[in-house]
């Protein structure tokens, strides 16, 4: 039971990209995966969007993504998720982004329902601030939806995925953008009809849908039949609930205009009476220096400028059941095995790092005439000189009990048990600086196995 349970365990793997240690996956799409990461230099959390170079090249999006990343490096607005840097390896592009801790605005609506008008207006004002800033720099979102609106620890809005529209958009010969819709409920009529569209007008429509959801708690356009849904969007078939104020109704109606040429613009939204109530323009420092060297390196072919991807295996963890089983007095294996006068295996604990433990064992075993084979935190030691029962072969593995406590197990895999005991006594003498507590003394009487 004990051995079978351990066999099912597998080593933990730490993956590093440059100075970042990657953690769990927090998002995934067709072209990219987003993983939580930690900057090992300052312990700051970040989110890293990982793109597959082969997929990007296959869809001929390299230059567009490169251009949009360069533009996004210039965007430093308090209501937009920040792009810190870009790295590249032979196979991947890594976009390092600000990690926002407050969750999605979508979750708040899904859990608690609609917002009060004052709160909805505050978030809408912050959304328009972000959209206006990015549009003024030629950056469009084109996939604005509640799920892309995050909140920081202070409850301020942060728009994610701004400027990375190339992952879902393509420019055709007419010079206009074309797309296949990911979330049709938020998408403007001209986008659904794929007739080519202006990115700014499409973003404004999506902002109108978002404002409606914040105030109503549900979408303005919904239908189980996708064709019927498209018809409702194309004709702007929606009604405002009775609790909407007159000012909110007027603004939403002007935003959800199916004709992009007559739809309200951001400059007009900023002058709208309902919008202006309690409005405070954002104040932030735009003085900064931006380098694009990292972008050139990420997309370049020079391997000297590529970031290193490193995989670091961690020792297998032991659970509470296994720790109890290690205690000789409670070792459940003894219930099923004949009494052993001679030990074929032994263990010790160590407070040293696992790599140091493996290195010290190797340094102690080699002078004793042992050939060493290592893989991760497992080691096979074989005596090159044959003994009474052939070559002594010892299997060793390091297990993690806690971050700073490890159990080292040595088992006789082949050869004479007496020779194994003698080897361990000599080895443990050499490992005084590594061994914290031993698994009892090796017994020296009885018949050898």
From Swiss-Prot:
It is an enzyme of class 2 (transferase). Highly expressed in leaf blade and leaf sheath, but not in other tissues. GO terms for biological process: signal transduction. Residues 161-190 are annotated as: Activation loop. Keywords: ATP-binding, Calcium, Kinase, Manganese, Nucleotide-binding, Phosphoprotein, Serine/threonine-protein kinase, Transferase. Autophosphorylated. The activation loop within the kinase domain is the target of phosphorylation/activation by upstream protein kinases. The N-terminal region containing the kinase domain is responsible for the autophosphorylation. Belongs to the protein kinase superfamily. CAMK Ser/Thr protein kinase family. SNF1 subfamily. This is CBL-interacting protein kinase 31. It comes from Oryza sativa subsp. japonica (Rice). The gene is CIPK31.
């Amino acid at each position: 039971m004990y051995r079978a349970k351990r066999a099912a365990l597998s080593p933990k793997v730490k993956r590093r990209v440059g100075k970042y240690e990657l953690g769990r996956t927090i998002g995934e799409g067709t072209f990219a995966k987003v993983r939580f990461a930690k900057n090992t230099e300052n312990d700051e959390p970040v989110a890293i969007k990982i793109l597959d170079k082969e997929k990007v090249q296959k869809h001929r999006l390299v230059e567009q993504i490169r251009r949009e990343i360069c533009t996004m490096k210039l965007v430093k607005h308090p209501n937009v998720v920040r792009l810190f840097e870009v790295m590249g390896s032979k196979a991947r592009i890594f976009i390092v982004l600000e990690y926002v801790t407050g969750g999605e605005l979508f979750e708040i609506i899904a859990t608690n329902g609609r917002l009060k008008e004052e709160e909805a207006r505050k978030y809408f004002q912050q959304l328009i601030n972000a959209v206006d800033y990015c549009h003024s720099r030629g950056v469009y979102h084109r996939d604005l939806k509640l799920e892309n609106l995050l909140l920081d620890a202070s409850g301020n809005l942060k728009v994610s995925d701004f400027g990375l529209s190339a992952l879902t958009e393509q420019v055709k010969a007419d010079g206009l953008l074309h797309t296949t819709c990911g979330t049709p409920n938020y998408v403007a009529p001209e986008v659904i009809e794929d007739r080519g569209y202006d990115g700014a007008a499409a973003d404004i429509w999506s902002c109108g849908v978002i404002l409606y959801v914040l105030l109503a708690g549900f979408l303005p356009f919904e239908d189980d039949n996708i064709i019927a849904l498209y018809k409702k969007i194309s004709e702007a078939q929606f009604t405002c609930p009775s609790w909407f104020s007159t000012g909110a109704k007027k603004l939403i109606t002007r935003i959800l205009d199916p004709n992009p040429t007559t739809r309200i613009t951001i400059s007009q939204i900023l002058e709208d009476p309902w919008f202006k109530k309690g409005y405070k323009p954002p104040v932030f420092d735009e003085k900064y220096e931006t380098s694009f060297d990292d972008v050139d390196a990420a997309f370049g072919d020079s391997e000297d400028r590529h970031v290193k991807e490193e995989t670091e295996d961690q020792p297998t963890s032991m659970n509470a059941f296994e720790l109890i089983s290690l205690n000789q007095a409670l070792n459940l294996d003894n219930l099923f095995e004949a009494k052993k006068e001679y030990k074929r295996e032994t263990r010790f604990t160590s407070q040293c790092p696992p790599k140091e433990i493996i290195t010290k064992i190797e340094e102690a075993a080699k002078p004793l005439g042992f050939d060493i084979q290592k893989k991760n935190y497992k080691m096979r030691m074989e005596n090159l000189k044959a003994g009474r029962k052939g070559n002594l072969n010892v299997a060793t593995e390091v297990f993690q009990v806690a971050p700073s406590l490890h159990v080292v197990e040595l088992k006789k895999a082949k050869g004479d048990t007496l020779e194994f005991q003698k080897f361990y006594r000599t080895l443990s003498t050499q490992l005084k600086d590594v061994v914290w507590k031993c698994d009892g003394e090796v017994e020296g009487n009885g018949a050898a196995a």
